[in-house]
């Protein structure tokens, strides 16, 4: 007896605390709905519902707990009904039940649902019994199948949309193009290479090989220039240009060591081996200035 | 003859050796808009600047193995702008931690008779192209996004065709020699452009 009483008390306490929590969250939800309805967002409402559902779950767990005695077996009998205000009751119920009287008791100590609700429930049970076990089973199965189909569709949709977002929709750069462009800028690969060899027209674009010239760097591939077919190329060597950082300093400090000219009959007049100042008088038009490729610069 | 490496040159007054730090990448045509938007957000606030340049690369072949290269550039859409002559040295190798390609760089503005001058000096034009694109700045960093057009008829800059379906993206800084923290800043900026563009140090010698 003692044990059962203790168990009863303990479970009652647990139940009380759970119910109090539930009441609080319900209260806050109602407050939210009433006062902040214009700012309310669906996720926030969902949160409140989730909270309520969680609390109901714990309540259920408490009731199902093995240490909980069957409350069904307990009966609550009002001992005294009085129409007077009861301060104690007021305090305990937080002002909701001021009087423990004839009107209050049937509502609060109810164990059966309303008569109308009871009628409806009875009707539903008779309907269900009428259908028959097999038909009922079939209906249950079809309901389950439809629910699972729907769930599958939803999850598939969710998965697809997620993966669509993660997949990089398109490549934004092409490494081969990068290399081609860098090569074009660095040493003219793929651009029309001008060979001052007297032959007409630009060389075929993209033709590497003898025509390919490499951006100035030592140790790179040497351009083969045969002596004879390349006219009017005096061999200049050792051009050193001063490091001029600002405009205007360019002409200063240019020293050219001009060695002997090429063997070709069309050659410039020989210059003395000395520092050469660029003066108007020096410039003689080298023959072949009217060569087609040079007409560009007219 | 190639200029000796910068580190060997004595510092004898006057000019400072400027180095160009370079990172390159490319972007496909259809992603150009997104890249431009991102650059407009990241870079200094200025009017979007487009340019059309015609660049010619001149070679001076000597008795030595490697020719001397000069690059002449002129603007096709800005009348009256000076021509620009540039020398770019060999990329300085060795430091694997350096995140950008570093090479000696000499820039100068010239008058319009540059090509005549170079021809007289004995340079010959090796190749030319037209570059059309956008220019952005962030501090000392310059970001250029441009398309290279091949010139079909020499000398005729109207008759061009695109070299590829991509735009070349270059992030460059011209700074005095020895300032390697610049390359760290460049790498941080390049990180912000991923995954649209991968800016990296591309060694031209690898692409011969």
Curated annotation (Swiss-Prot), chain B:
InterPro entries: Mediator_Med18 (IPR019095)
Top-rank taxon, per record: Eukaryota
Gene3D superfamilies: Hypothetical Protein Pfu-838710-001
Protein's cellular compartments: Nucleus
One GO term (biological process): positive regulation of transcription initiation by RNA polymerase II
An MF annotation (GO) of this entry: transcription coregulator activity
Modified-residue entries (Phosphoserine), positions: 66
GO cellular component, one term: mediator complex
Name this polypeptide is given: Mediator of RNA polymerase II transcription subunit 18
Organism: Bos taurus
Gene for this chain: MED18
